[in-house]
Regions:
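Hydrophobic alpha-helical segments
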Residues: 111-255
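Short helix-loop junctions at transmembrane helix boundaries
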Residues: 38-48, 52, 121-153, 210-227, ...
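Basic-flanked hydrophobic alpha-helices used for secretion and membrane insertion
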Residues: 312-326, 330-555
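Alpha-helical membrane-protein architecture signal
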Residues: 1, 5, 9, 103, ...
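Hydrophobic alpha-helical transmembrane segments of multi-pass inner-membrane transport and secretion
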Residues: 16-44, 53-89, 109-123, 237, ...
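Short cytosolic juxtamembrane segments of multi-pass membrane proteins
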Residues: 2-3, 178-192, 570-571, 661-669
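N-terminal Sec/SRP start-transfer signal
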Residues: 1-30, 194-199, 208, 244-292, ...
Length: 669
C-alpha cells in the first residue's frame, strides 16, 4: 500500500507543471460551489425585500455550477491522463499489473480530492462572506458583518465533489483496463497521423453556422427569438467543432498547396505542425471559442440588465404612482383625481408631474391594412399580433400642449415597434380610420412597455369612439372567448415624499377599503418604490450569477489554453530538436512558435467575436422581454466586455507563448 501511495505522490510531484493548475482549478470549483450553496441557504438574503428572487436564482445557479464542474473537470483530467499513460505503460512493462496501476491512480485521485477540498473549502469559507456582502450590495440591502461557516454547504460540497472524483477515477480505470501495455506506451503519441481533409464535415459546419447566423439576424418576434436562440446555440456549438476540427485541416491543406505562402520558414513549420495534429488542436480551439462566447454573452447581458435597471424601472413605471381605473365614466374623471389628491394629502404628499389619459384597448392580427380582432387571443406566433390603444385626441393635446383637430373617421397614430404601411386602418367590421398624422412621441403605458408585441396608438376625435369600439370588442369576446374589457383611465403621478409614505399610499389604494363617491368596475394601483426591490432582486441576481459564471468560464478557457500549449510543447519538442539539428537557430524557432501560437490563440477569440456579433440581434430581442430595449447601450456594454476579455486573453497568450517556447527550445528539460 505504501508503495502505491509513494508512486502516486511522486507522480503528482514530478508532473507538478500539469497537476498544480489542475488542483487549483478543482479548488476554485469547490470554492465557487460552496459559496453558491451557502448563499442559497442564507435566510437573511431570502428574507429581505427582493432578495427572495436572487435566492431562487442562486439555487438554480448552484445546480448549474455542479454540472459545469463535473463536465469541465472530466475534460481537464483527460489532459493529465494523456500525459501519464506512457508512465503507466512503463510500469506495466516492468511488471506492475493493471490492478497495481489502478491503485496508483486511485491514490492520485484521492490525493487530488483531499487537497482540492482542503484548499477549496478553506477559500470558500474565507470568501463566502465577501460574496454575501457583494450579493447584499447588489440588491442594496444591509448585511450582518458576522463571520459564519455553513455546515450544510460544506457537507454538500464534500458529497458533490466526491461523486465527481469517483466518476473521474472510474473513467480513468476504464481506460487502463481496456488498454494494452504497448498502447499505454504509445498513447501519448496517438493521433500523430495527420487527418485527411474532410471536405464534407467542413462544408456541413459552414452550412450549419450560416443557418445559425441567418436565424439570428432574421427572427423578429421576441418569443420566437428564445426558441431560435436555443436552436442557434446548438448549431453554433456543432458548427464550431466541425469548422475548427475539419475546416482547419482543409485550410491547412489549401495553404500547403499555395507554394508562395507555404515555403517560407515560419509558415512551413507552423502550417505543417498545425496540420500534423489538427484534429486534437481543433477540439481544444473550439472549446476555447465556445467558452469565450459564453463569457461574452453572460457578462454583457447581465451587466446590461443590472446597470440599466433604473431605466427599465422607469419605462415600466413612468411615475412614482400608477393607477388604472376600469369602467370610470368620462364625467367622473375630475372627481376621481380629486379623491386621489385627498388621499395623497393624508400621507403628507401631493400629486405632481401628472400623466393621464383614457384608452380603450383592442387586440388582433394585422393582415394588410385590416386588424382582425377575432384573432386577438390567438397563440399563433406566425401572426402579426398587435395591441391597439384608442385614445381621445383631447388627452394627447393636454399632455403635449398641442392643438390637433380631427374629424369623424380620422385618427393620428403613434407606433411602438413596427409601423403600419397604409394611410387607412380597418378595425375588423366595426369601421376604419384614415391616418392623418404619424406622431413622433407618446408616453406609453407601463404594462404596454412590458409586453413583447408591437402596439398601435390611435388618437381619435372623442370619447364616443372609445365606447363604441369597447362594445364591439366585448361582443367579439363573448363570441370567440377571452376576457371582457373596459375603458381605462390611466392616471400616473410623482409624489413629493419619501418611499415609506409612497408605499403607505399604495397599500391604502390597492388593498384598503377606500370609498369613492362614484362607480367604476376596478382600480389597479402600482408603485415604483414597491417593485424596485423585486427588480433589483431579479437583475441583481442575474448579475451576481453572471459574475460567478463569467469568472468560471474565463478560468476554464485559460486552463484549456494552458494545458493545450503545454501538452503541445512537450509533443513538439522532439520535432523542434530535429529542426535545430538541421540548422535552424533559436530566432527562427521563436518566429515559427509565435506564428503557430498566434494562430492557435487568436482564432478562437476572433471566432467568438463573430459569434457575438451575429448573436447581438437575438440577444437584443431576448433582453426586450426583460424591458431592456436600448440596443445602443447593450452594444456599448458588449464592446467593453469584449475589450476587457481580449486584454486578458492577450495576457494569457503572452504567458503561454513563453512557456511553450521554453519547452520546445529545450530550456525546460
Amino acid at each position: 500500500m505504501k508503495l502505491y501511495f509513494r508512486l502516486a505522490a511522486g507522480g503528482i510531484r514530478r508532473n507538478s507543471r500539469l497537476y498544480v493548475p489542475y488542483i487549483m482549478t478543482c479548488s476554485l470549483m469547490v470554492m465557487m460551489y460552496y459559496i453558491t450553496d451557502a448563499l442559497s441557504g442564507d435566510e437573511m438574503l431570502s428574507a429581505m425585500r427582493g432578495g427572495y428572487i436572487m435566492h431562487e436564482l442562486i439555487v438554480i445557479g448552484k445546480v448549474v455550477m455542479a454540472l459545469f464542474a463535473a463536465i469541465f473537470l472530466f475534460y481537464t483530467n483527460s489532459f493529465l491522463i494523456k500525459s501519464r499513460m506512457r508512465e503507466f505503460g512503463l510500469y506495466n512493462i516492468l511488471g506492475m499489473g493493471k490492478n497495481g496501476i489502478a491503485r496508483v491512480m486511485t491514490w492520485e485521485t484521492l490525493m487530488v480530492y483531499v487537497i482540492s477540498m482542503v484548499f477549496g473549502l478553506g477559500a470558500g469559507i474565507l470568501f463566502s462572506k465577501l460574496a454575501e456582502l457583494l450579493a447584499f450590495k447588489i440588491v442594496q440591502g444591509d448585511a450582518a458583518y458576522q463571520f459564519s461557516v455553513s455546515g450544510p454547504a460544506a457537507a454538500a460540497s464534500l458529497i458533490v465533489f466526491a461523486v465527481i472524483f469517483l466518476l473521474i477515477c472510474l473513467n480513468v480505470l476504464r481506460q487502463v483496463f481496456f488498454s494494452k501495455p504497448v498502447e499505454l506506451l504509445r498513447s501519448e503519441n496517438s493521433g500523430e497521423k495527420p487527418p485527411k481533409a474532410n471536405w464534407f464535415a467542413a462544408v456541413l459546419g459552414a452550412l450549419m453556422l450560416g443557418l445559425a447566423y441567418f436565424m439570428a439576424v432574421t427572427i423578429e418576434e421576441p418569443l420566437s427569438a428564445i426558441l431560435a436562440f436555443m436552436a442557434a446555440v446548438i448549431l453554433v456549438i456543432a458548427a464550431t467543432y466541425l469548422l475548427f476540427v475539419a475546416g482547419s485541416v482543409v485550410l491547412c491543406r489549401v495553404l500547403q498547396k499555395n507554394k508562395g505562402y507555404y515555403y517560407k520558414t515560419n509558415h512551413f513549420i507552423s502550417v505543417s505542425q498545425m496540420s500534423y495534429r489538427m484534429r486534437k488542436n481543433g477540439a481544444g480551439l473550439a472549446s476555447i471559442c465556445i467558452l469565450s462566447t459564453m463569457v461574452l454573452v453572460t457578462l454583457s447581458t447581465t451587466i446590461c440588465l443590472y446597470t440599466g435597471e433604473e431605466q427599465i424601472l422607469r419605462q415600466r413605471y413612468p411615475r412614482d404612482m400608477v393607477t388604472m381605473t376600469y369602467g370610470l365614466p368620462e364625467e367622473d374623471i375630475p372627481a376621481f383625481r380629486e379623491s386621489v389628491g385627498a388621499l395623497a394629502e393624508k400621507h403628507g404628499a401631493s400629486p405632481e408631474n401628472v400623466l393621464a389619459y383614457s384608452y380603450a384597448e383592442l387586440s388582433g392580427a394585422v393582415i394588410g391594412n385590416r386588424l382582425d380582432m377575432a384573432r386577438g387571443n390567438s397563440d399563433d406566433v406566425s401572426l402579426d399580433l398587435r395591441s391597439v390603444y384608442v385614445v381621445p385626441i383631447a388627452d394627447y393635446n393636454a399632455l403635449y400642449g398641442t392643438d390637433i383637430q380631427l374629424a369623424d373617421g380620422e385618427a393620428a397614430a403613434y407606433f411602438k415597434g413596427k409601423g403600419f404601411g397604409g394611410d387607412e386602418i380597418q378595425l375588423d367590421d366595426w369601421g376604419s380610420y384614415r391616418i392623418t398624422q404619424r406622431l413622433g412621441e407618446f408616453t406609453i403605458t407601463g404594462t404596454d412597455s412590458a409586453t413583447i408585441y408591437d402596439t398601435i396608438y390611435l388618437f381619435v376625435k372623442d370619447w364616443s369612439d372609445l365606447e363604441s369600439l369597447n362594445d364591439y370588442q366585448n361582443r367579439l369576446t363573448d363570441e370567440y372567448g377571452g376576457m371582457r374589457s373596459n375603458i381605462v383611465y390611466y392616471y400616473c403621478f410623482d409624489l413629493d415624499c419619501g418611499e415609506d409614505s409612497q408605499l403607505d399610499l399604495y397599500y391604502e389604494m390597492e388593498y384598503g377599503d377606500v370609498e369613492f363617491p362614484f362607480h367604476f368596475e376596478r382600480l389597479k394601483t402600482e408603485c415604483r418604490a414597491r417593485d424596485h426591490e423585486e427588480f433589483l432582486g431579479l437583475y441583481g441576481g442575474l448579475f451576481f450569477l453572471g459574475i460567478l459564471f463569467g469568472g468560471v468560464f474565463i478560468l476554464a478557457a485559460v486552463l484549456i489554453m494552458y494545458y493545450k500549449q503545454i501538452s503541445e510543447g512537450f509533443n513538439d519538442r522532439a520535432r523542434f530538436d530535429i529542426l535545430r539539428k538541421v540548422g535552424m537557430n533559436d530566432r527562427e524557432i521563436r518566429r515559427a512558435v509565435n506564428s503557430q501560437v498566434l494562430t492557435v490563440f487568436f482564432a478562437p477569440l476572433i471566432a467568438a467575436g463573430i459569434h457575438m456579433a451575429f448573436a447581438f440581434p437575438l440577444l437584443t430581442k431576448i433582453l426586450g422581454l426583460f424591458n431592456m430595449r436600448d440596443a445602443g447601450f447593450l452594444a456599448i456594454v458588449t464592446l467593453i466586455c469584449f475589450a476587457v476579455f481580449a486584454a486578458l486573453y492577450v495576457a494569457v497568450y503572452a504567458l503561454t507563448s513563453r512557456s511553450y517556447y521554453r519547452i520546445v527550445s529545450g530550456n525546460n528539460r
